[in-house]
A protein has these predicted regions:
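Active-site and NAD+-binding cores of ADP-ribose-processing enzymes
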Residues: 20-181
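A short, exposed loop/beta-hairpin motif centered on an aromatic-Gly-Thr core
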Residues: 1-7
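Short active-site loop/helix that positions an aromatic residue
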Residues: 10-22
Length: 181
C-alpha cells in the first residue's frame, strides 16, 4: 500500500464526529477537535468489513482496493460467503438518519461478536460519511489500545465551517513522547 489513504485521516474524523459537519451543508460555526496520532507497537489482528460490492465508485482508496482484491481472491467462488459479506457490509455502510441510532443495532451486535466472541482485536470498515472514498474507520478493543498502541501526539484543532466550505487549523500539538507542546 502506498499509504495515500493516511492523508485523509483528519477528513474522516471530522466527517464522522463533528457536530457542525453532521448538521448539514448549511451549518455555520466553529468547533474544537482533538486528533491523536498513535504508533502500533505490536501487530493487531484486524477483521475488515468488505464485500464484492463494497463502494464500487471509490477510486482513490488503495487500502480498500487491496482488501477487496484479497477478499475476492479467497471467496469469489463461494456464493454463501459473498451473500453474507454483502449483508454485513451493507449494515456497516448504511447511512443512518439523525435520531434513528437504533438502525446501528445490527452492526453494533456484529462488531461486538467479532471483537468479544471471535476475539478479533479490531474491526475496520469504510467511512460511511465519505462513501468509502477517503479511508477506513477502526474500532479497537480498549485492552488492545492499551497494550499494542503508543500515543505519540495530540493535535488541538479548530474546525471553521461556513455552509459548504470548511477549514481545519491546527492550534497546537502536544508531543507526548517528549512532554512538550
Amino acid at each position: 500500500d502506498d499509504e495515500y489513504h493516511l492523508e485523509n485521516a483528519r477528513a474522516i474524523g471530522i466527517s464522522e464526529c463533528s457536530l457542525l459537519s453532521n448538521m448539514g451543508k448549511e451549518s455555520i460555526g466553529r468547533e474544537y477537535i482533538a486528533n491523536s496520532h498513535w504508533r502500533i507497537v505490536e501487530n493487531i489482528d484486524v477483521v475488515c468489513i468488505v464485500s464484492a460490492n463494497s463502494y464500487k465508485n471509490v477510486n482513490n482508496n488503495k487500502l480498500l482496493e487491496n482488501i477487496k482484491n484479497d477478499f475476492l481472491n479467497c471467496f469469489s467462488e463461494n456464493e454463501e460467503a459473498l451473500f453474507v459479506s454483502d449483508y454485513v457490509e451493507r449494515e456497516f455502510s448504511k447511512q443512518v438518519t439523525k435520531g434513528h441510532s437504533y438502525e446501528y443495532k445490527v452492526s453494533a451486535m456484529l462488531a461486538d461478536l467479532l471483537l468479544n466472541t471471535y476475539k478479533f482485536e479490531a474491526v475496520a470498515y469504510p467511512s460511511v460519511k465519505l462513501g468509502g472514498q477517503a479511508g477506513l474507520n477502526l474500532a479497537i478493543r480498549p485492552d488492545i489500545a492499551d497494550s499494542k498502541l503508543k500515543l505519540i501526539n495530540i493535535a488541538d484543532q479548530c474546525y471553521y465551517k461556513n455552509s459548504e466550505n470548511g477549514i481545519v487549523e491546527i492550534e497546537s500539538i502536544y508531543d507526548v513522547v517528549n512532554d512538550k507542546v
